[in-house]
Every structure is written in structure tokens, then in C-alpha cells.
């Protein structure tokens, strides 16, 4: 029997009343367990196996699917559960984590980062910015290391910078002619991308960003992911469509 602290990142129906629950845990990394009877409303496993739930878990199992014996809810992130926009961002965070990681490869930092992101979304901080931070932090997990602290071509640390997927990072004005397809970004967007990639989440504080800046950030991050990650996430497509509708509604209300 093994014990762990984890976050439920995916759940699927299994048989009539059971669930297969995918968790990311502090001790073991990503694991899967069968939660017998968890679909029944009166089951002692019903609450602790809900998506996004952070809890303590006890299970039997080896390298394959384990069997969940009991669980205790630490945090259920109730605000996320009750808000469709928060839910969409949190779902994307969890799917990205699921697709980017292998079974039983512990990474306590990644566990803590995911918990902090979900907690901050739940507490009402900007979910789009938090998700963009998470996307940048997940790049090394995917084996991707864009050069963000200096020019990816000449190594200079000063000057004006654009973002180049071709050169795998930012490039300075001295090297602009070497990538005609580079992404020209406002200076503050380049700085934020660098901050998101390099600085710890707790050092970033509460970042207040204009909608236009967030759109630039998303364009750069999406372009990089599309070029290098090899991932297609349904939750990301839904999230981008939802963002478009939300922005249209905001513009209509402002007119």
C-alpha cells in the first residue's frame, strides 16, 4: 500500500460505477488508479476523485493501474468548479501536464507549480496570464529550451528583441536580417515572456496586463508550441475559441 499527495488531472468512466483517475502526485509523478464505486454519489471516493481535487490518497499498485483505497480532500478549488471560464483554463493546465509527462517520474517542483497555478486561478487572479506562465514553465518539461536571456544568434543581452521560432528564442536587432519571418513583438511582451520562463512563480507577484498585451503573449506562445511541441490539445482549442467569444462580448459591452 502506498500513500501520496496528488491532484486529479483526468477522470474517465470505467464500467458501471467505477472511474479511472489520473493524478499528478508529489511523490510518484503521474499515476493512474481505479476508483471502485466512485461514480456513486454516496461513495466515499466520489468527492476526492473529482477533477482538479487536491488530496491525500492511499492505493495499492505497481507499475500499472493501481486501486484507490481511500482519499482525503485537501482542496477542491470550488471557485474553479463553479465558473466555466476558470474550468476551461484549469482543464487546459491539467491536460498539458498529462500530455507532457510520463508515468512515475517524480517532479516535486512541477507538482508545486501546478498546485500554485490552480490555487491562484481559484482565488481569482487572471487565469489567462497564469496559464501563459504555466505554458512557458512547461517548455523544459517538454524538452524545449528557447533562448530567452540573450540573443539566440549572437549572444548579445542588450538592444531591441523580437521572437524567432526559427532561431529558438529571442534575437536582437543586430540579427533581424537573419530571420525575415521573426515575430515582431512590443518590448514589454518580450520582457514578460522572459520573466515567465526564467522567474519563479512566487517572485512574479500579481501581474496586471492589458488585453492587447495578453493577445500578443498568446500569439507568441501558441506559435512556439505549434512549431516545437508536437501536441494537439482539445482543451486548448476550446480555450482559444472561448477567449475569442469573451473578447467579442467585452468589446460589444464597451461600445
From Swiss-Prot:
Gene Ontology terms: biological process: DNA recombination; double-strand break repair
The UniProt family comment states: Belongs to the RecO family.
Annotated Gene Ontology cellular components are:
bacterial nucleoid
Sorted alphabetically, which keywords does the UniProt record give? DNA damage, DNA recombination, DNA repair
Q: What SUPFAM superfamilies does UniProt report for this protein, alphabetically?
A: ArfGap/RecO-like zinc finger (SSF57863), Nucleic acid-binding proteins (SSF50249)
Q: Which gene encodes it?
A: recO
Stated role: Involved in DNA repair and RecF pathway recombination.
Q: What name has this protein been given in UniProt?
A: DNA repair protein RecO
Native organism taxonomy: Bacteria, Bacillati, Bacillota, Bacilli, Bacillales
- One of its Pfam families is RecO_C
Q: Which organism is it from?
A: Listeria innocua serovar 6a (strain ATCC BAA-680 / CLIP 11262)
